[in-house]
Amino acid sequence: TRQFIFRARYVMLCTNGYSLLVEPFFKDKVIPTRGQVMVTEPLAERPMPTCGYSHYGYMYYRSTFDNRLLIGGARHLHKASENDTTEDRPNHAVQGSLDDYRARFFPDVTAPVARRWAGIMGFSADGLPIAGTLPDKPRVGFAVGFTGHGLSLGAGTAKRAVERLLNGTHAGAVDVDRFVAVVD
């Protein structure tokens, strides 16, 4: 978008893991972290009737609507390469750990892997999303730092961020004020 100039009364940054690339304010607040996933070809029957987590949430699995096994996680085994990065291509070492997990916990699932991918998440410094406006730009709001839970926390956090931007309403537990010294 460097070719164009956009004008707006208000701007909302919903940049999550890429926040620091857009605004230096997020330097000590949002850490880009790569998440990785693999999914098999369709299976004759569903390997698990539900989704699940293990290894304290660092590994997860679920069956897809078309009977594929999806496994993700393993970043706890590769912290140096997975934390503080915006590289969004799969890492072979992490993908190998996902394969090892499948072999150990789902030994009967022998279907080939159909796809592997990675994506960047924004982890906040304290584990909660962050909503607010930039201290030096009160017409620029943001909802970032979902710490891997953007689907479940995104809509509510965005609503609070918009209310903060338009009305100055405090965003509660997710308000940026917890990171910024407030001077009266």
Regions found by a protein language model. Name each.
Residues Y10, V37, P112, R139-G141:
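Structural motif
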Residues R34, Q95-D99, L151, A155:
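Short, hydrophobic/amphipathic alpha-helical packing segments
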Residues L134-D184:
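C-terminal lid/capping helical subdomain adjacent to the catalytic/cofactor pocket in oxidative enzymes
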Residues T1-L69:
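Flavin-dependent oxidoreductases
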Residues V22-P24, S81, S152-L153:
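Short glycine-/acidic-enriched loop or helix-start segments at secondary-structure transitions
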